[in-house]
Design a protein with these regions (language model features):
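Divalent metal-dependent phosphate-bond-processing catalytic cores, especially two-metal-ion Mg2+/Mn2+ enzymes
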Residues: 22-33, 60-63, 70, 77-88, ...
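Acidic/His-rich, divalent-metal-binding segments that scaffold phosphate/diphosphate chemistry
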Residues: 21-107
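Short, surface-exposed loop/turn segments at secondary-structure junctions
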Residues: 85-88, 110-116, 139
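His-Asp-centered metal-binding catalytic motifs of divalent-metal-dependent phosphohydrolases/nucleases
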Residues: 92-111, 125, 129, 151-156
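A short glycine/serine-rich beta->alpha loop
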Residues: 57-63, 110-116, 216
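Fungal secretory targeting signals
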Residues: 1-23
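Acidic/histidine metal-binding catalytic segments
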Residues: 87-91, 137-151
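An active-site-proximal "capping" alpha-helix that borders the catalytic cofactor pocket
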Residues: 72, 119-135
Length: 270
């Protein structure tokens, strides 16, 4: 999940459960099978179906996480459906899997395979998503895997995305649609309404606050130097003060440099 913002990119089988009517098609980029979820047409490949099944595991302990992941995917898909040129430019399967799995590192279940002791949750999520694709017959090349990984790991650093590929950008952009606030003109109001009706966002902030606090509590080695520091210092006894790794490194290095090179000349331009 991300808190920064960045500029938007450019602009039959029988009925099953309500709001999910599958449509048959080929498997090339232009003819992927689709279905409807919350009245939003989405890609429906076996890999995407497996990703949806995976995130449903979060419902018992973290229903807000499941809803967040589904909304992120569906908001992006709704924007694509509203812009044929954009939709044709995006790898829809990559987008689906990347958005659905972008917060695997939030998994609070004991012995979660996506909760390392020393990596940021974005990295755990990206590595977990790559492993998922490989283990579930995705048969993606390394470039495709990297685009998904980058979109997941950069989700909290939207300002770093300039010049990145459209697929990485749209994983992040789709997550940005997720937060309550002004609605994006890229998504129809009717689509917002159907998505929020099926996957409500009424606990997204409380759930996020709890998850970030839990991350600081359970893996401080993976949260130091990230924005999770704020939650650790605010809510976790004994976490310690907020880290200033880069600042401490540079300022400490200045003193050492002067001591080691007393005769060197440096002219400040400030």
């Amino acid at each position: 999940m991300k808190f920064s913002s960045f500029a938007s990119c450019l602009a039959a089988a029988g009925a099953v459960a309500a709001g999910r009517v599958p449509h048959q098609g080929g498997h090339d980029k232009g003819q992927l099978p689709t279905t409807k979820i919350a009245n939003i047409e989405v890609v429906d490949t076996p890999l995407v179906q497996s990703a949806v099944k995976l995130v449903k595991q979060f419902i018992p302990l973290q229903p807000y996480l499941y809803n967040h992941l589904m909304r992120s995917w569906l908001f992006g898909a709704a924007a694509f459906n509203n812009n044929a040129t954009l939709k044709a430019s995006v790898d829809l399967e990559l987008h689906a899997v990347g958005t659905l799995l972008h917060d695997l590192g939030w998994d609070m279940r004991p012995n979660s395979p996506w909760h390392s002791a020393n990596r940021p949750f974005e990295v755990d999520s990206g590595l977990g998503a790559v492993a998922f694709v490989k283990e579930n017959g995705g048969n993606w090349d390394e470039n495709r895997l990297e685009r998904m990984y980058d979109g997941i790991t950069l989700q909290g650093m939207g300002s770093y995305l300039a010049g990145k590929n459209i697929d990485s950008n749209w994983i992040v952009q789709s997550v940005e649609f997720e937060f309550p606030g002004p609605r994006s003109p890229l998504i129809r109001n009717a689509d917002y309404d159907t998505i929020l009706a099926e996957f409500p966002n009424d606990t997204v902030f409380r759930g996020t606050n709890e998850t970030f606090t839990w991350l600081a509590l359970t893996k401080p080695a993976g949260t130091r130097g990230t924005f999770i520091d704020y939650f650790g210092t605010a809510y976790v006894p004994g976490y310690g003060p907020q880290s200033h790794v880069a600042f401490d490194l540079i300022t400490g290095g200045v003193a050492d440099e002067i001591a080691q090179h007393p005769n060197s000349t440096f002219v400040s331009n400030l």
